[in-house]
Amino acid sequence: MRGMKYLHTMVRVTDIDASLHFYRDALGLELLSRRDSEAGRYTLVFLAAPGDRSAQIELTYNWPAPDGSAEAYTGGRNFGHVAYAVDDIYATCQRLADHGVTINRPPRDGRMAFVRSPDGISIELLQAGAALAPAEPWASMSNVGSW
């Protein structure tokens, strides 16, 4: 190590099950670890792209208060986004769509797409290497919402 190493990006989530469905099941990240803290009333989940633990995402879920009220998070585009390189942008977007995820910015150019997590975190997907040739149905799809 040269004095510093990137570890992870942490995002707060409001529903750990919906978030795991999105990040693990739909997006295809691998679950590295999960820690449920009864005393601290929180859950920490670490995930990473398959075969690459060097860039991890930490999902932090703060359990509801004893009265049942959940913590609300507000954010905006000032956070920016989390980005992943994928082997096949079209197959990745199709898998996400098959899991009910809206493709906010379809990969019309065969290179880039955006989706949002259940908590509204913008996720950029970039085709690894050269862009794929434009293909339907993606090439003619319009943007949906903000990304």
Language model feature labels by segment:
Residues 19-24, 96, 120:
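Conserved active-site tyrosine of GNAT-family acetyltransferases
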Residues 1-6, 30-83, 93-118, 128-147:
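Vicinal oxygen chelate
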